[in-house]
Swiss-Prot record:
SUPFAM superfamilies: Oxidoreductase molybdopterin-binding domain. NCBIfam families: PRK05363.1. The keyword Metal-binding applies. PANTHER family: PROTEIN-METHIONINE-SULFOXIDE REDUCTASE, PROTEIN-METHIONINE-SULFOXIDE REDUCTASE CATALYTIC SUBUNIT MSRP. PROSITE patterns: TAT. This is Protein-methionine-sulfoxide reductase catalytic subunit MsrP. It catalyses: L-methionyl-[protein] + a quinone + H2O = L-methionyl-(S)-S-oxide-[protein] + a quinol; L-methionyl-[protein] + a quinone + H2O = L-methionyl-(R)-S-oxide-[protein] + a quinol. GO terms for biological process: protein repair. Predicted to be exported by the Tat system. The position of the signal peptide cleavage has not been experimentally proven. It comes from Escherichia coli O9:H4 (strain HS). Gene3D superfamilies: Oxidoreductase, molybdopterin-binding domain (3.90.420.10).
Length: 334
């Protein structure tokens, strides 16, 4: 396995840029800018968070047993754990980057049920313990690129999705894999209130082609930094597809269904001209409202360390995944 490219800059995207983008998205969804201030007065918290103002996180999970295969270890500079678990997009708990850490403690992750169904010979159900015990866990240091043009490097812990799908034995009719987040509005304020949840339709849904899901890079993720995922990172199990934008990494998954037809996906339903089904990281295909040519790496530095670095095609994983898209127009199929 070839090591992935990375440029060593340490910087953080200005919050004013995030607020502007979020307001534009919400306006497109029919939500007034004034509504942003209705449920939360926390918009001013984010800059203070980056300046070192401690904000309590949901409790860290239990330590996990895992291996560290050499193929997935590298010398990329890691994003500190407080930023990995304190700077998140998880609209079910609010729009601000700090909201998930502040609000996700309400999510009950044990007991948990994950069902695999659809075009499979052997449907199956996993419980909470199965997620960390049924498959050997391994740590993988992956780049993570948000569609908002910021990035992290994270030591995720999990198992390849293809191992889970193999147990279910996909039939010849299976062409796609559909994923669904838990729907629990009593625990997730963004599912109760469209202003808190960004006006999205819930539960959150995502999808991959079957060959993407079966790729060895695609990870069912149950931990980070040596411990079980905290709720704000998508506990107890989330998807990581490192060559795609972060919104493809659906969190708190309760359903995986293999299908004949391409499944709907949440952000594509909300704004199809802005968020495609594939969502492959591509510096040559801009978002309609901002460039994807560069990104800001969230590292150990503060907001005064701001510098951009070039975005890499397929987030630096082109050697491993480019063949999946041979002959596909990546501008049309963004």
């Amino acid at each position: 396995m070839k090591k992935n490219q990375f440029l060593k800059e340490s910087d953080v995207t200005a919050e004013s840029v995030f607020f502007m983008k979020r307001r534009q998205v919400l306006k497109a969804l029919g939500i007034s800018a004034a509504a942003l201030s209705l449920p939360h007065a926390a918009h001013a918290d984010l800059l203070s968070w980056f300046k070192g103002n401690d904000r309590p996180l949901a409790p860290a999970g239990k330590p996990l047993e895992f291996s560290k295969p050499a193929a997935w270890q590298n010398n990329l500079p890691l994003t500190p754990v407080d930023k990995v678990s304190g700077y998140n997009n998880f609209y079910e708990f609010g729009l601000d980057k700090a909201d998930p850490a502040a609000n996700a403690g309400s999510l009950k992750t044990d007991p948990w049920t994950l069902k695999i169904s659809g075009e499979v010979a052997k449907p199956l159900t996993l419980d909470h313990d199965d997620l960390t015990r049924r498959f050997p866990l391994e740590e993988r240091i992956y780049r993570m690129r948000c569609v908002e043009a910021w990035s992290m490097v994270v030591p995720w812990i999990g198992f390849p999705l293809h191992k889970l799908l193999a147990l279910a034995e996909p039939t010849s009719n299976a062409k796609y894999v559909a994923f669904e987040t838990i729907y629990a509005p009593e625990q997730m304020p963004g599912q109760q209130d469209r202003f808190i949840g960004g006006g999205l339709k819930y539960p959150y849904v995502e999808g991959l082609r079957l060959d993407e899901a079966m790729h060895p890079l695609t990870l069912m993720t149950v931990g980070v930094y040596g411990k079980a995922l905290p709720p704000q990172n998508g506990a107890p199990v989330r998807l990581i597809v490192p060559w795609k934008y972060g919104f493809k990494g659906i969190k708190s998954i309760v359903s995986i269904k293999l299908t004949r037809e391409r499944p709907p996906t949440t952000w594509n339903l909300a704004a199809p001209d802005e968020y495609g089904f594939y969502a492959n990281v591509n510096p040559h295909v801009d978002h309609p409202r901002w460039s994807q040519a560069t990104e800001r790496f969230i590292g150990s530095g503060g907001i005064l360390d701001v510098q951009r670095q070039p975005t890499l095609l397929f987030n630096g994983y082109a050697d491993q995944v480019a063949s999946l898209y041979r002959g596909l127009d990546l501008r049309e199929n963004f």
